[in-house]
Regions:
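Transmembrane alpha-helices and adjacent helix-loop boundaries
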Residues: 1-340
Length: 340
């Protein structure tokens, strides 16, 4: 007999978040692992996508005793279809990707022509600016109250486990699609050009590659993936609040990429599942092992210590990550010289 409460808990607290963070990790891996672009504002793109997705799936709420209200566009879809939430979910996800991609484009255009550290500074600033802008845009985002009661595309009433499992499966299907597309792209000549830029941009320039445009493409696509994942995350939590998108989130995503294996699309998915399970385990450890109230708060610090120890162990024993990037060497080196 399957424990439905366990299915509900695993789907909501581990599997679905792991799939969502895997999408973010794939986006960051495209930027950093394949192209060498340092993005310190992952949480900013993620938060922008979360709010765009939330706005498209919720009705507008005016100011009142419960808060300043927020913008909502889901009612617009009632004119065309009875499936307003599903359409809002799809349109909101696409809009989240578009807006996050445009923000990434605006940041990348002036900074990618400069030294790499300017991009890091600009994206770091984005993370702070995005959160403060969300917090102070009361009529649109709900301010510090955020956007509440965000619906899911699939609801099964009293069968909570069905609702949670269906959403986890939805996120899993999206991850498979994103992985397939990125895997194909990074194995194509376009992806090999990105790796050439990562290894030696001057050499790529000498071979006639438009390195600026290639870096721009990689950064914008990565930012768009982060925004789309943010929309999924808001629907998972059913709420979007500014405090969910702090620099700690950026650090977590970077840890997933490093632990899994930077430059390996499969590896970063493994890293996302590993780090998300570590968080899930520490959240549930107190109940599983009947720990005393002494661990109520301290268990969260134990998680940070565990992540730190994991990173140190990887640096010492597996610096390339759990699933390292494969290094391919041609079996016919004479091809490079035009002779047999």
């Amino acid at each position: 007999m399957v424990d439905l409460s366990l299915v509900t808990d695993l789907s909501r607290a581990w599997i679905a978040p792991a799939f969502i963070f895997a999408i973010v990790a794939l986006g960051l891996n495209l930027q950093w692992g394949h192209t060498g672009l340092f993005n310190a504002g992952v949480a900013g793109f993620f938060g922008i996508g979360a709010y765009i997705g939330a706005i498209f799936t919720t009705p507008a709420i005016g100011p009142g005793p419960g808060g300043p209200g927020h913008l909502g566009l889901v009612s617009l879809f009632a004119i065309f279809t009875p499936y307003t939430v599903l359409v809002g979910f799809l349109v909101g996800g696409i809009a989240a990707m578009v807006v996050s991609g445009l923000v990434g484009l605006l940041i990348a255009i002036p900074t990618l022509r400069l030294r790499a550290d300017y991009l890091a500074i600009a994206t770091l600033a984005l993370g702070a600016i995005a959160v403060e802008s969300i917090r102070n845009s009361d009529p649109v985002t709900g301010g510090v109250y955020g956007i509440l009661r965000i619906p899911r595309p699939w609801e099964f009433g009293q069968d909570v486990w069905r609702t949670e499992l269906a959403y986890a499966i939805t996120a899993g299907v999206i991850v498979l699609l994103v992985f397939f597309l990125i895997q194909r792209a990074t194995r194509a000549p376009w992806g090999r050009a990105l790796k050439a830029i990562r290894e030696d941009e001057d050499a790529a320039l000498a071979l006639g590659k438009n390195t600026y445009f290639l870096k721009l493409q990689a950064f914008v696509i990565g930012a768009a993936l982060m925004g789309g994942a943010g929309a999924l995350f808001a629907s998972l939590l059913r709420v979007a609040v500014p405090d969910s998108f702090t620099p700690a989130l950026t650090f977590s995503i970077w840890t997933m990429v490093i632990v899994g294996g930077s430059g390996n699309n499969k590896g970063v998915i493994v890293g996302a599942f590993a780090l998300t399970f570590l968080e899930y385990f520490t959240l549930r450890a107190k109940d599983w092992f009947n720990l005393s109230s002494f661990w109520d708060i301290r268990i969260f610090y134990v998680r940070l210590i565990a992540i730190g120890l994991l990173l140190i162990a990887l640096i010492l024993f597996r610096p390339a990550g759990l699933v390292p990037e494969p290094r391919k060497v041609t079996k016919k080196p004479w091809i490079l010289f035009g002779s047999r």
